[in-house]
Amino acid sequence: MQDRKPQQIARELALLSLSQLPLNPKKLTEEHLPKLVLATVRTLRAEVQDTLDNAAAELQRSNDRLLTSQTRASDLNTARNMLQEAISHTQTAINQLGASVEFPELIQLANQDKEVGRYAIKLVKIINEERGMIDEQITSALVDWQVTRLAQIDRDILRIAVAEMMFLNLPNSVAINEAVELAKRYSGDEGHRFINGVLRRVSDQKKALSV
């Protein structure tokens, strides 16, 4: 955490805050950030527990299937798929738990470093005020998919990156790399690859329009 730059911490705070916004985001100030993050911590804690419960249930079902099957290929394949799904659920929960360890420090840094708070608030405000344009850019880069159907954490990571590309003049490559790192911490097992692919297409489209 100590080696991370203020803007990296701010992105993480913005990501954690997006799902906990007040009804009128224009009134959002730096003082709101700790409360937003705390509310998100509570939400994520419940999500982690649900994910672990789902993983445990999948493991039990796959184990039962293996024990009761008579080595039939269909049963073994089903059990294997269930086991893989359980492992995926567990990995997602582990990622979330690992990130949650740093939440108290994130809140402290937001209070201590004004640059962190200002940039996080700027990101959140831009995403809310320009959401239509940002989502349109993301949608154009999705293949047979809609923004509204994405997992919320993936959708918010994409919105942060596109907001930085479009409105904060952050180089595309930097925005993409930062989004991928966020996805590795908060998204599912394949989330960072998906986000990288979408943002690469956004970047290519921007370059094509500027020619």
Swiss-Prot record:
It comes from the Bacteria. The keyword Secreted does not apply. Pfam families: NusB. One of its GO terms (biological process) is DNA-templated transcription termination. One of its GO terms (molecular function) is RNA binding. GO terms for cellular component: cytosol. InterPro entries: NusB-like_sf, NusB_fam, NusB_RsmB_TIM44. Keywords: RNA-binding, Transcription, Transcription antitermination, Transcription regulation. The keyword Translocase does not apply. HAMAP family: NusB. Belongs to the NusB family. Involved in transcription antitermination. Required for transcription of ribosomal RNA (rRNA) genes. Binds specifically to the boxA antiterminator sequence of the ribosomal RNA (rrn) operons. This is Transcription antitermination protein NusB. The lineage of its organism: Bacteria, Bacillati, Cyanobacteriota, Cyanophyceae, Nostocales.
